[in-house]
């Protein structure tokens, strides 16, 4: 099995926005099996991927992409501080997660969610802890609570989508990724995750290609691995 790990907002220093941001410990956004598109350096026609790495995005805007959507993640746009009384507790929870002391992290995060139920980040991280402990039902509840606390928390939708995908609930996972994209159409990770879901688990290759191309379009510089995935997917579709 091939693991593609993305650490999102994982920080050891609690900043002014620490309790508002969705700190994620080793967020496994993209866990794909060996059928993940090959990251080869050659196309079937013998050309290097580098020769076509900008093929998606430069020739036009991907279908269905909202170019007029805000450029800033709406969850991060809120610059308000979190409660000062929770910062030390949250920092200790993050430290416990770094040390993989899941039981201590659980206790600290449960305390945070009890004392500060309007904060989304602690619920999100509690869900990640439960996921690590293979307590999937508890993890699902925590991720849903994170979304309830702040419906703009894109990481929570994606973590929930990952969990549901692992359980074989592909339609439910799809719904979570779609919700994240509805919140912010320019969230690249959501497009990548739903693309993987469509490609590897639901057999919706054209939909997967569309979201992969949107992901690539959103990159400041073309992503070489994604370019390889797009080429492989087009080959399988017959484009």
Regions found by a protein language model. Give the residues of each.
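Structural marker of alpha-solenoid helical repeat scaffolds
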Residues: 115, 149, 183-184, 217-219
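C-terminal motif of bacterial Sec signal peptides marking the signal peptidase cleavage site
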Residues: 31-32
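Structural signature of tandem alpha-helical TPR/SEL1-like repeats
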Residues: 99-107, 132-145, 166-179, 203-214
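Alpha-helical segment of the N-proximal tetratricopeptide repeat
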Residues: 79-119
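Terminal, low-structured helical/coil segments at or just beyond the last alpha-helical repeat
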Residues: 200-239
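Helix-start (N-cap) detector for alpha-helical repeat units in TPR-like alpha-solenoids
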Residues: 86, 120-121, 154-155, 188-189, ...
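Canonical tetratricopeptide repeat
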Residues: 125, 159, 193, 228-229
